Regions:
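Short hydrophobic/alpha-helical segments at membrane-entry points of transmembrane helices
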Residues: 27, 111-117
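Small-residue-rich segments within alpha-helical transmembrane domains of MFS-like 12-TM solute carriers
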Residues: 35, 39, 121-129, 160
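Residue-level signature of mid-helix packing/kink "hotspots" within the transmembrane helices
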Residues: 39, 67-75, 160
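Membrane-interface helix caps of multi-pass secondary transporters
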Residues: 41-53
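Membrane-interface helix termini in secondary transporters
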Residues: 47, 78-79, 168
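Conserved MFS/SLC helix-loop-helix module at the cytosolic interface between two early adjacent transmembrane helices
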Residues: 72-110
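Cytoplasmic helix-loop-helix junction between adjacent transmembrane helices
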Residues: 116-154
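Helix-loop-helix hairpin linking two adjacent transmembrane segments in secondary transporters
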Residues: 151-176
Length: 176
């Protein structure tokens, strides 16, 4: 048998399904968590306003730091993924985004809080480009449409769930 014939193997449909499920699970989990993190800022803004005596302009600037960092580092996240792998960079970004919120909880002033939001935005910048890429590579043709719809739905679940849980917890626990 020739080397060319050895390279021509019939794809295993069970393996392809497993890859699809794994990619969709990772992408949906990351999207729910990251979008939940992102919308959690809206619950925290009035808390920070009260805690640090901030006006609306300062709150808007803080939100801009988070969103601007998130937006600005999406393309560099793609470059990092090409070098280190999308799943690795996505996992590290998710951890970094969560760490940004931990830092925010330790903030004793506005400058530290803004730095924490920068860290959170930096971590959050990995999700959209890398999770979308995982889905695009795992699903062929029109099958990617349903997968992307599921992925977007998962993000909306995160937007709804994390802020709601945080709002409930703030009733019984301090924000820190």
């Amino acid at each position: 048998m020739s080397a060319a014939a050895d390279d021509m193997q019939v794809p295993n449909p069970d393996s392809a399904k497993s890859t699809e499920r794994r990619a969709l699970g990772v992408a949906c989990g990351a999207h729910a968590l990251h979008d939940g993190y992102t919308d959690l800022v809206y619950i925290l803004l009035p808390v920070w306003q009260n805690e640090f005596g901030l006006g609306f302009a300062a709150l808007g600037l803080m939100r801009t730091v988070f969103s601007g960092t998130l937006a600005s580092f999406q393309i560099p996240a793609g470059f990092l993924a090409e070098r280190f792998g999308a799943v690795t960079v996505l996992a590290l970004g998710t951890a970094l985004a969560g760490f940004g919120y931990v830092l925010a909880g330790f903030s004793n002033g506005v400058a530290f809080l803004v730095a924490a939001l920068f860290v959170g935005g930096l971590g959050a910048s990995t999700q959209h480009p890398l999770a979308s890429s995982l889905i695009a590579h795992a699903f062929a043709g029109s099958r990617s449409l349903k997968a992307l719809g599921t992925y977007n739905f998962a993000g909306d679940i995160g937007k709804m769930t994390l802020p709601a849980v945080a709002a409930f917890l703030f009733i019984v626990l301090p924000w820190r």
